[in-house]
Structures are given as structure tokens and as C-alpha cells.
Amino acid sequence: MHTGLHSRLGALTLLCLLPMSASADFLADSQLSLETRNFYMNRDYRDADKPDTPRFRGLPKAKSEEWAQGFMLRYSSGFTEGPLGFGVDGLGLLGIKLDAGRGTSGTGALQVQRDGEVSDEFGFFGPTAKARLGKSVLTVGSHAPTLPVAFRNDTRLLPQTFQGAQIVSNDLDKLTLTAGQFRATRLRNSSDYEDMTMFSDGAGGGVASDRFNYAGVTWAPSSSLAATYYQAELKDNYRQHYANLLHGLPLAEGLTLKSDIRYFRSTDEGHTTVDNRNLGAMFTLMYKGHALGLAYQDQEGDTGTPFIGGGTDPWTLNTVTFHHFLRAREDSWQLRYDYDFAASGIPGLSLMTRYVSGDNFEIGGQDAREWERDLDIAYVVQGGPLKGLNLRWRNVAYRGSHTTDIDENRFIIGYTIKFW
């Protein structure tokens, strides 16, 4: 495991070296906030006789259930004055168990001990040093990336983080260049950094790795058109190419067609057997608060699309609340509907529901199918002393051939305090 001690010392050293005369922008542009998140999750295993049913001390579980309180303290400094500016960011995380009975761990929200029980609390501190030259920013330390080839997971109590270095440049007009290397990851329910692993259905030969290299470019000639390309490598596991086209087409007053096309090509690296081509397209009609989307995802090759294991979210179109629909050779389609109730005079209230179905794959040599139905209802308080308080209910039903069926509910209450 990696403790992050060197990055902490580096950040503290940088702070000490910053000249007081150059700290005007460093302090004036700084921000400090505290996000609180109350998280409850219940996952009911509908059939406990399947090979993939989670177990506790050898016996199949009937459910996983946890309730916890999370705190996320975020500090972001400005940059020192001059052509080359320096700054420091910091992320402090604390998760506290409120309730988790014996044998009900496993939602991914709380830290699990070796005996299968959960810790009463767990925490993490991650500093990040940064430097800016022109419109290019270099960051070294803890990151919470939202990259198509490495997307941090933030679907439970606390967010996942990665340790490494990244540079983002906007010096060229309409172009964003990104490159970096991650050396370790901290899972969403952990206090420590560790080596990265690969998940790819049907693939063999994966090993723990301390190198994830990536580089990409996004070209956005207008607000309605963007094209992206990334290349990535999890050393000794897989190589991956990613291409994406986003386009918004006005059809009539208030009516827009949004197109989102994504392609992944993944091959082996080291001694793995990764071989996957993933092409997905989603088309969404948007009109006065309504959004109706239809997606189709086709996979070819001997394995499923690979991604960094441990809860990292693959940036594929049919990765949804519970399942990712990335089994080897699996094809899947999605129907989604969103509604913003501000169009009906109720600002802050929103609804999302979707249905995803996958087939054309095998489990244990047998033909299989699966589907998932999701429902999200969220509300953000618009005024008064609780302005900004957000409440969300997530409901999931998953059914599949030769797999454990689940029904799931999540209740999330969040509030952010901005100190400055």
C-alpha cells in the first residue's frame, strides 16, 4: 500500500517556500468548502443460491445494508503572482458508520475489515501541489479524475482518488490537451493507496500495476460540437484507444437532438488476453424539460471492455447504477427519460428513469440475458436557511440469467458549506 507521505511533505514544503510577497492571488483566489453526505443503501439479494451471491463466513447473504455519514473538506488555493504560479489543493475525507449489522457489509460505502465487519470510521487526507504557466496547469498528488479512460467513482459515501501527476493545457484555441500518469488508487471505502488492477470479463493474466499512463485531446469548435481522442495504458494489463463525438442539433424552437458516439478499442499488454471493440451511440431528444434518449452498444472480441478495477466507473454508454453491461460479446440497448420539473414551475425537482437490456453473451457456457431498471428522484432546496440542501432517492431492479437478482434502494442527503 502507498501512504501518500511523500506527497504530503511535498505540499507542505511548497507552502513554506511560497514568498509572502507573491501570495496575494494565492490567498485571494482560494476556496474552502465542506460537503456533508448522509448515505443509506439496502441491496436485497433475491436468490441466494447463485455462484456470484455475496457470502459472509461461508453463508450466502440475504442483503447488504449500510448507513453512514460522510464529510469532504476541500481546499483550493489560487496561484502565486508571476508568469509561473504555484499553489496547493487539499482533500480531507471522513466516513462514520451509523448502522451496519453483522453480515450486512458489502455495499461499498464503508471500510471492510479482514473479519468481514466494517470499521466505525475511516479517513483520508490528500494534498495536491500545482503549477500554472499560461493556460497550462500541472498537478502532482491526489486526483479525482473524470476522464473517459479513468473516471473516479463517487456513487457511495466518499469519492475514489488516484495518486499521480497530470497536466492540462488550454493554450491552443478550441483545444484541450491532457496527459498524465497515476501510480496508485484509493478505493471509495479505503484510507490507503494501493496498486491498480484490471477488470475485464473473460480476460486472464491481469496483475497489480503501479503505472497508468494516458494522453488525450478534445477539439470543441463550437458549443454544440466536440470531438475527443484518448490513448491509455495500464502497464502489464491493457492498452486502450478512445474516440468520442458529441453534437447538438437544433430541430425547432426549444427542440434539440443530442448525439453521443463512443468507441473503445482495447488490446492486451503484458500477458493478458484482452481483446475488445466497443461501439456505442446514444441519441437524445430534448424539449422543454423533457429528455428522451435511446442508446445501443455493440461489443466484439474475446473479452469485455477493460477498466481499472475497484469500483472505477467505465465511461461506456450503458454503465448504469448497478451494472455496466460489459460482459464479453454482450450487446445492449437503453431507453432513458429525464424530466426537469422547473418547466412545470417546480425548480429543483428532477426525475430520471431508464431501462437497459443486454444479451448475446454466455455465463458458464450457457446463453444469458440481463436487464436493469433505474429510477432517480432528486430535489434541491431553492431558498431559505437550507438553500442548496439536496435529497435523492435511487431505486434499482436487476435481473439476469445465472446471476443473483437484486432490488436496491439508496437515500442520499447532501449539503455543502462554503466558507469562502
Q: What is the predicted function of each stretch?
A:
Residues 75-106, 115-195, 217-225, 293-301:
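Outer membrane beta-barrel
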Residues 175-201, 206-208, 254-332, 393-411:
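Outer-membrane beta-barrel translocator/channel fold
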Residues 32, 82-86, 135-139, 174-178, ...:
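Repeated loop/turn-to-beta-strand initiation elements of outer-membrane beta-barrel proteins
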Residues 24-25, 77-79, 130-133, 169-171, ...:
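Residue-level signature of outer-membrane beta-barrel architecture
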Residues 28, 65-71, 121-125, 159-163, ...:
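Residues that define the transmembrane beta-barrel architecture of outer-membrane proteins
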Residues 25-45, 84-88:
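Transmembrane beta-strand segments of Gram-negative outer membrane beta-barrel proteins
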Residues 215, 335, 375-379, 405-420:
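Outer-membrane beta-barrel "beta-signal"
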Residues 38, 138-152, 177-179, 215, ...:
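Transmembrane beta-strand segments that form the barrel wall of outer-membrane beta-barrel proteins
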